[in-house]
């Protein structure tokens, strides 16, 4: 009776609402990360007398802390669970984003300067003192941001595993991962104008409110997450048909009860951190991320400054915003890339793991295109923009 009812019932699609929340969180994650790269050259550097070295130091430490925090973020999310783990992660990084806005005030107080105008007008040895002091404060805020942001992808992947069967997880992952592209896409057309607007009305130097406004988006997400998220088996918005679809990997008619029990035991088995390194999959992901993430983050952090220095377009000009927008618009192709493993499965009958590996091999060739960005940039600024977009 129950089987007939489930099969004839129209399936709800609440899993896609959850996926949209993951998308939103990832977009906010990248928005918060981009505020500094889009404001430092034209808004922050004149105030604190920064050079490329100062900014590079901040981004390097952020990247190191983010990498270290990632080692523990997954365990933290497993310990707290998807709901609380995600809430804590986004609360920490949103707080970190907002803390950036206090760095100017903290620098003034530390050096006993009257106001921002005295800081901008400083000369001689004082400029170096201002730069170094402010860098320390920005590093502190950046560390908080990095620790919080490290929890986004482990939490999102855990939720995806809870709400999607194995055959759909790559596509769902590509959708929420596209939030990083959307966040980066929205950033150049929202953050510099925000900073310019608040500067024009006399609210600080403008960049402070950009950090606060963008950081506040995370707190809005937290309210929605508390209301919307429950595990699918206890969520009243997930009907029986959808729950059966989500749990189809646990109800494979081609497997015996013993095989299913063994598979469930393996999936639920907890292993130590060091034991993870015994699996070749761990090393494959580690090496893959090591080889690609550094390149992507380099483009993420430095492209706005590259456009400003090489082509003379400040971050708040229409041309600069258009160039960054087009770059990240091209990376939106990643959504369709997530569908490739499903296409391979349907056409070849390969298992999900083999299909994902084949798709990853194809995508691994794309970053090589970035080698042509700099030499072709001598002919037109459009070449590096398009090439970096495709490589990303």
Task: Tell me what each language-model feature is.
Residues 86, 138, 357-360:
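Primarily marks hydrophobic transmembrane alpha-helices of the MFS/SLC 12-helix fold
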Residues 37-68, 113-136:
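Extracellular/periplasmic helix-loop-helix junction of adjacent transmembrane segments
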Residues 36-41, 274-335:
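Extracytoplasmic gate region of multi-pass secondary transporters
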């Amino acid at each position: 009776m129950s089987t007939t009812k489930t099969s004839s019932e129209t399936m709800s699609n609440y899993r896609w609402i959850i996926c949209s929340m993951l998308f939103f969180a990832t977009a906010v994650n990248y928005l918060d990360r981009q505020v500094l790269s889009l404001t430092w050259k034209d808004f922050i550097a004149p105030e604190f007398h920064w050079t490329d070295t100062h900014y590079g130091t901040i981004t390097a430490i952020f990247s190191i802390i983010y990498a270290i925090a990632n080692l523990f973020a997954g365990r933290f999310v497993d310990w707290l669970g998807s709901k609380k783990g995600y809430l804590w992660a986004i609360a920490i990084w949103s707080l970190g984003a907002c803390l950036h806005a206090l760095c100017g005030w903290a620098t003034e107080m530390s050096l006993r300067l009257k106001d921002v105008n005295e800081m901008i007008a400083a000369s001689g040895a004082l400029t170096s003192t201002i730069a170094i002091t402010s860098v320390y404060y920005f590093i502190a805020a950046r560390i908080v941001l990095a620790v919080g942001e490290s929890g986004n992808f482990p939490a999102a992947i855990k939720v995806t595993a809870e709400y999607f069967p194995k055959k759909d997880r790559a596509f769902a992952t590509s959708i929420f991962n596209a939030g990083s592209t959307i966040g980066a896409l929205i950033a150049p057309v929202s953050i510099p104008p925000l900073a310019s607007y608040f500067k024009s009305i006399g609210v600080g130097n403008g960049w402070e409110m950009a950090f606060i406004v963008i950081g506040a988006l995370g707190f809005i997400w937290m309210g929605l997450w508390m209301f919307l998220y429950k595990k699918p088996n206890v969520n009243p918005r997930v009907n029986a048909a959808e729950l059966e679809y989500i749990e189809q990997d646990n109800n494979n008619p081609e497997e015996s009860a013993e095989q299913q029990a063994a598979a469930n035991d393996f999936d639920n088995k907890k292993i130590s951190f060091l034991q993870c390194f015994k699996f070749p999959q761990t090393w494959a992901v580690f090496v893959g991320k090591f080889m690609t993430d550094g390149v992507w983050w380099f483009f993420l952090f430095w492209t706005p400054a590259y456009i400003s220095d090489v082509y003379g377009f400040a971050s708040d000009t229409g041309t600069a915003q258009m160039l960054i927008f087009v770059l990240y618009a091209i990376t939106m192709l990643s959504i369709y890339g997530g569908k490739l493993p499903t296409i391979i499965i349907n056409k070849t009958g390969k298992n999900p793991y083999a299909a994902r590996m084949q798709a990853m091999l194809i995508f691994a060739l794309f970053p090589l295109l970035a080698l042509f960005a700099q030499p072709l940039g001598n002919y037109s600024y459009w070449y590096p923009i398009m090439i970096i977009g495709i490589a990303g």
